[in-house]
Amino acid sequence: SRWCQPTKPEDSDGLHLWIATRPTGESHRAGRFCRRLAILPSGGGRQATEPLVVAAAIPRATLIPSGEGEAMRLPAVLPAEVATVSSRGWPDGWRVDAVLKAAAFPGWDPDEQATLGFFAAVVNRRLGQIPLFAPPEYPWDSDPTTWSFLELAD
């Protein structure tokens, strides 16, 4: 069974992404150009059965830019115009598919910055955190130097 709470995305079952839109590879602390997105297989809509994408807090970084020059309070559900997601559930698991537009990352222009810092983990209340790479005891949830780089191509 899934435990997906948009008000508590850090603990919710889902695919969690950490993105740095201006990665330096030097700072051990997530800054204003870092974003954590929780792609939840359910928890949205009137019946809480719809998938959604939630901007979640990164430890030691509680505010992120909203795109309008102010900080956004977290957690914050991303609007469908910038993040579309679908999900499918089975008795023993779930699958999510998501498309994230550049607007999901305030202050990022893909034409100017084609390299992103990237990390991903599956969060599951029964199984714990399952990181893409690096052991669970590493500080990948808050330290961008533990993330890899994505090079975007045309």
Regions found by a protein language model. Give the residues of each.
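Structural preference for beta-rich elements and adjacent junctions enriched in aromatics
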Residues: S1-D154
